[in-house]
Amino acid sequence: MSSHGNSLFLRESGQRLGRVGWLQRLQESLQQRALRTRLRLQTMTLEHVLRFLRRNAFILLTVSAVVIGVSLAFALRPYQLTYRQIKYFSFPGELLMRMLQMLVLPLIVSSLVTGMASLDNKATGRMGMRAAVYYMVTTIIAVFIGILMVTIIHPGKGSKEGLHREGRIETIPTADAFMDLIRNMFPPNLVEACFKQFKTQYSTRVVTRTMVRTENGSEPGASMPPPFSVENGTSFLENVTRALGTLQEMLSFEETVPVPGSANGINALGLVVFSVAFGLVIGGMKHKGRVLRDFFDSLNEAIMRLVGIIIWYAPVGILFLIAGKILEMEDMAVLGGQLGMYTLTVIVGLFLHAGIVLPLIYFLVTHRNPFPFIGGMLQALITAMGTSSSSATLPITFRCLEEGLGVDRRITRFVLPVGATVNMDGTALYEALAAIFIAQVNNYELNLGQITTISITATAASVGAAGIPQAGLVTMVIVLTSVGLPTEDITLIIAVDWFLDRLRTMTNVLGDSIGAAVIEHLSQRELELQEAELTLPSLGKPYKSLMAQEKGASRGRGGNESAM
């Protein structure tokens, strides 16, 4: 077929799009895409291949690192390395985690302050409402999928006697856990919030109470005859003797009481609340807040340039992180049997949410193909799998969305830090599913009210799960306590949590990224008004000019892709 015939075919099929049904339009769109792909392959040259490799170098290196890391780990497992040797082997991966965590604190503060300051209160309120609705809807859907999967597959049938326990889980009263969540939203010391979180500790104290009893068993305080009574003929000495017969018994017992305490780690929730409020105040100061806006915008730009340097080391770190985790696992057989069914259930649930629900939401809102978008997030997703922390992945997520996919920086600066802190779809799904699995292995039948309680508690607890490794295990105590399930049974699933934690972190990061794209699409009107009215300096340049440059760069990248 000649190029003229190909063009004629494309033009005629385009005219028919308005007359045929959506199914036929989809079929013709796929045919056009296949034809364009065939034409690109026919005209491909070595220069095109090199350009593709340069443009996708990060992704190719990261995927290769995962494959090499898994292969290397299984090749070294027969040598049975000691724990010390494994730690030495994993050291390059530890360095990557430390580099990324180093950037999280200034990135959260600078991006949120700049994002809030660049929008007026009305626009911020609308975007915040859209973000809250998106977070709530996706989290509820994730919890529903988790409950549905564990109910259908029923991985907990059988007995828990065959399951191996690992570690210990600290029991935390539900009320104290939620109060700690609220306390952490308002840290009394911002400097301390950079490295500590409030956490209720528990101590025991001895309580002593006096119990008064009488020899004849009468109640304390019962009426006694006066010291001397002529009527009953008793003497003063006799009455004193009777009074001495009253016994005082001292009872002592231990009582557990909550006391203020702390835990190491960034109080991300408190910093998010402060940064949002501080950014809104700076935005309301108009011209007077210009210096502060310049400062935080320059800080954000400097952090992103550091990310651009560290990102080249990411494939090496991911390789050793994944290989080290596989080497640490003593018995790979725990992935089979009853825990194997549990693992499969979690994987199926996460796949349904991340592979079907989130892309469907993206398609319904934006009317665009979600899979090229997910492909653009591939490096952030692989980094999430390697680091097992949505907060540590945040710098890479910013880079993928802003530079790779061209999402508006005013949206990413607002949505991503908040999402990495409170939007945990994968964690919510996992907690609901794991709670019902523990009920199943205990042969405990849950009624509709208890399942509803698990749904609500898992949704709320996922907000309190900071973006740190295995935080879901801690918040799951809240879910189990809410329906009276034994919290010590969490140790039954710790053996596979290192693997599932990586998958749910990938789901969390994808949910935040799609949320940014969805909110950007819904907020186009507010963004255009802000672009016309507001000038936000960025390294001495007007924000409007910066946005124009970014759009031009995005069009340039799109042109290069079409050339392929």
From Swiss-Prot:
It catalyses: K(+)(in) + L-glutamate(out) + 3 Na(+)(out) + H(+)(out) = K(+)(out) + L-glutamate(in) + 3 Na(+)(in) + H(+)(in); K(+)(in) + L-aspartate(out) + 3 Na(+)(out) + H(+)(out) = K(+)(out) + L-aspartate(in) + 3 Na(+)(in) + H(+)(in); D-aspartate(out) + K(+)(in) + 3 Na(+)(out) + H(+)(out) = D-aspartate(in) + K(+)(out) + 3 Na(+)(in) + H(+)(in). InterPro entries: DAACS, Na-dicarboxylate_symporter, Na-dicarboxylate_symporter_CS, Na:dicarbo_symporter_sf. Na(+) 2 binds at residue 421. Brain, mainly in the cerebellum. Expressed densely and selectively in cell bodies of Purkinje cells. Na(+) 1 binds at residues 419, 423, 508, 512. L-aspartate binds at residues 388-390, 427, 468-472, 501, 508. The modification Phosphoserine is found at residue 2. Coiled coil: none annotated. It comes from the Eukaryota. The keyword Chloroplast does not apply. One of its GO terms (cellular component) is presynaptic membrane. Keywords: Amino-acid transport, Cell membrane, Chloride, Glycoprotein, Membrane, Metal-binding, Phosphoprotein, Potassium, Sodium, Symport, Transmembrane, Transmembrane helix, Transport. GO terms for biological process: aspartate transmembrane transport; chemical synaptic transmission; establishment of localization in cell; L-aspartate import across plasma membrane; L-glutamate import across plasma membrane; L-glutamate transmembrane transport; monoatomic ion transport; neurotransmitter transport. The chain crosses the membrane at residues 56-76, 99-119, 133-153, 262-285, 295-322, 344-365, 411-437, 498-519. GO terms for molecular function: glutamate:sodium symporter activity; high-affinity L-glutamate transmembrane transporter activity; L-aspartate transmembrane transporter activity; L-glutamate transmembrane transporter activity; metal ion binding; neutral L-amino acid transmembrane transporter activity. Contains eight transmembrane regions plus two helical hairpins that dip into the membrane. These helical hairpin structures play an important role in the transport process. The first enters the membrane from the cytoplasmic side, the second one from the extracellular side. During the transport cycle, the regions involved in amino acid transport, and especially the helical hairpins, move vertically by about 15-18 Angstroms, alternating between exposure to the aqueous phase and reinsertion in the lipid bilayer. In contrast, the regions involved in trimerization do not move. Belongs to the dicarboxylate/amino acid:cation symporter (DAACS) (TC 2.A.23) family. SLC1A6 subfamily. Homotrimer. This is Excitatory amino acid transporter 4. It comes from Homo sapiens (Human). The gene is SLC1A6.
